[in-house]
Amino acid sequence: INLNGQVLLLDGAALDFTQFWQKIYASPQNIFHACSEDIDLIYHYAQQRPLHNVFDTQVAMAFLGHGLQVSYQNALKTCLDIDIEKDQTRSDWLARPLSQEQLSYAANDVLYLMQLAEALKNQLQQKGIYDFVLQDCQSLTKEIAMQTPLDELYSDIGNYRHSRRELMQLQ
């Protein structure tokens, strides 16, 4: 998490996030890059939907003509001329303790996010399209909220490979 320039690494498996979820929903704006998975997890664990105060830098990049799915790494290079390593993307994030490489990767994943967001907001405002990006981000978070209800998530677990009995067990 990047909180006003201070990077904090939190272990979701070891903490109670109840107050944290409340702060996210009360925050004037939460900044993400490619927010879908993060938003889905927030909805699942916070038990609250939808999150309205989102600015997604990937959506902003698309509005500025950089393509629909620009990676965080490429967004940083394009907008800020910053290179970051993405070599830990597929490492085992469930194993504890996390390696120093994983911790550095996690910190870099948010270290430049606010700086990137500010650069993008400036470009969007200059083009007069900032409000359209905010509307699109709000539509995206609503769409994620309308996807599979929490009590039916079991059915998303490769149900085409499971028998009715296995699906009942998952439920």
Across the structure, where does each feature detected by a protein language model lie?
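Mixed-charge, glycine-rich, non-catalytic linkers/tails in nucleic-acid processing enzymes
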Residues: 103-170
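Conserved DEDDh/DEDDy metal-dependent 3′-5′ exonuclease domain
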Residues: 1-123
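Generic low-polarity alpha-helical segments
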Residues: 1-3, 168-171
